[in-house]
Amino acid sequence: MQKFTFFVSCAKGIELLLKDELERLGISSQEKLAGVEFEGSIKDAYKVCIYSYLASQVMLKVATDKVINQQDLYEFISSINWMDYFAVDKTFKIIISGKHYDFNNTMFVSQKTKDAIVDQFRNVINQRPNIDTENPDNVIKLHLHKQFVNVFLCLNIDSLHKRSYRQFQGQAPLKESLAAAILIKAGWLEELKKHQPILIDPMCGSGTILIEAALMAKNIAPVLLNKEFKIFNSKFHNQELWDNLLEIAKNSQKVTNAIICGFDIDNNVLDKAQRNIYQAGVEDVVTVKRQDIRDLENEFESEGLIVTNPPYGERLYGDQLDELLDIFNGFGDRLSQDFYGWKVAVLTSFADSIKEMQLRTTERNKFYNGAIETILYQFKINEHAKFKHETQLEKNIRIAEASAQKSDEHIDFANKLKKNLKSLKPWLKQTGLECYRLYDADIPTFAVAVDVYSEHIFLQEYRADATIDQNIAKQRFYQAIYQIHKTLDIKYENIHTRVRQRQKGKEQYQKENDKNKFHIINEFDAKFYVNFDDYLDTGIFLDHRKIRQLVAKAAKNKTLLNLFSYTCTASVHAALKGAKTTSVDMSNTYLEWGKNNFTLNNIDAKKHSFIQADCISWLKTNKDKFDVIFLDPPTFSNSKRMDDILDIQRDHELLINLAMDSLKKDGILYFSNNYRRFKMSPQILEKFNCENIDKICLSRDFLSNKNIHNCWEIKYK
């Protein structure tokens, strides 16, 4: 039987797997870049076309030569006796791959090749074969490399990776040949030797991995699924041999007891997978159902293999990146808890997702899904697989340290911290303050507020604009954590973080966490409990420092009504100056916190009033009069404890009028709010003596944010 040289192409990264596959077919080959080469018969080449799960193209090598100009190219192509390869009545097309030093235009190479072939036929028999780019009888491929041109005749007209079963696919489809490659690399062929092989794809998408696994389990030759497969129509083609080999392949299929299961959280994707499974004819082996990967359970009697190709991070998830990472964290937990003894393989281009699994890899291999470089991470689930449990603090430190290596942007942030601290030092020394704002989005790219509480930092991230890449914003936030630790010499565990955004309803009063860890801070002659972790705010508003002093001074040895009193810090300052205070707030939690603040300052809380109530409703029924009132409402609130929604711009006139009804004629109302676009009601300005005291209430550490609050002193005329 006549021997030829064949080149079998494949995706980069699977050459060795393809070489092994050909060995199983009885064909010895040599590994090349993006393929293998072997000496063999047409029958050998047909077997590759029929049985290979990994090959893309099987090509008969025609000729190779060095070519340095267009005339060389024409003469080289003309030197090949094309009439030995196909008849004049057979159509052909030309495809070009690779790069040549002297030819930048592949269209030119294709045209010159076509001219040489057509001219040869015309010169010899006065007829010419026709070009057909859609459905040719033969495909001639030229691969360019440096100054060499390699000419091949393709046995398969379309790529072998096309199986025809995939009529429905998701956003990032995995090539069938690559799915087969990762299954083989992960050990599916060895698994098939077991009494009952088991394979799970917990993020199965449109089902490609499941179907390829089933084809191998049932020994279905891939070419049998390709309804549009077309073998070349060359003079070397042997139709009888081809038909006989196809018949052998059909008769080689077998029944399997393999268990192949797929899961996905998306019902639409599962519907596509189910239709593809039926199209491939493997519905007797493959089952799919809806399930979150974080709820994956081991319902099997023996160990098996888990292979999956999850969505590629930012490419599909975008600003849902945190959700993706959480999914992988949960996946890693399920594997270590419930799949002891199993082997796992995950193909992804997104390394951060693998880190979240917190499992030790046993092997890593590079593959390409088209142009996308991916890594196949393999794991063996045993007592050595799981990394030590990573606490949230350890995770934050790891991400912060890694983020600092990704760019140098944070250097400017560090320099700004140093500059601000140097500027504030004389004032801090003069006042004796240990709690202050050090930084407030001074650099637009680092939109955070840094509040110093002695040896602790409260780091607040302002919600990034929708136009800002959420992943970049997250990276900068962690870079800020890194620089606070490094520049200010603050322990990582003393850096407490929060994202600032509008709170709705009961969220304003709900706990963020449940650590119940309180710290004591000093403000002038008062002490306060603060909590950095459990609530949205710490328990004290640093920007209200000056207005607390004004209120306390005005209320000395008098009566004070503190409305929306929060943790009663203003009441404490006033009580220390001899005031009798009444604090009103909707939250019993904060009122209890306020009582503890009184006790901390050796003030008998029983001699003061703490009232849990909606301030508006309470004011409407209050009959007492006060010397000083401090009214500091939120900008917006729709708590279920309130009779109505509070909107400070809309409702401040009502609030002030009600508060003034509880004020003595010679008393003072201090009104404050944080709504940046606040406009005082003309009716209030007309009715009372109103003085804006924003500048008086602005502390040295808040000068860069002059609109942080609106403060008014209001008296009767």
From Swiss-Prot:
The keyword Membrane does not apply. Keywords: Cytoplasm, Methyltransferase, RNA-binding, rRNA processing, S-adenosyl-L-methionine, Transferase. Specifically methylates the guanine in position 2445 (m2G2445) and the guanine in position 2069 (m7G2069) of 23S rRNA. It holds the Pfam family Methyltrans_SAM. It catalyses: guanosine(2445) in 23S rRNA + S-adenosyl-L-methionine = N(2)-methylguanosine(2445) in 23S rRNA + S-adenosyl-L-homocysteine + H(+); guanosine(2069) in 23S rRNA + S-adenosyl-L-methionine = N(2)-methylguanosine(2069) in 23S rRNA + S-adenosyl-L-homocysteine + H(+). Belongs to the methyltransferase superfamily. RlmKL family. This is Ribosomal RNA large subunit methyltransferase K/L. It is an enzyme of class 2 (transferase). One of its GO terms (molecular function) is 23S rRNA (guanine(2445)-N(2))-methyltransferase activity. Residues 44-155 form the THUMP domain. InterPro entries: 23SrRNA_methyltr_KL, DNA_methylase_N6_adenine_CS, RlmKL-like_Mtase, RlmKL-like_Mtase_CS, RlmL_1st, SAM-dep_methyl-trfase, SAM-dependent_MTases_sf, THUMP_dom. Signal peptide: none annotated. Its EC number is 2.1.1.173, 2.1.1.264. One of its GO terms (cellular component) is cytoplasm. It is found in: Cytoplasm. HAMAP family: 23SrRNA_methyltr_KL. The keyword Membrane does not apply. Gene3D superfamilies: 3.30.2130.30, RNA methyltransferase domain (HRMD) like, Vaccinia Virus protein VP39.
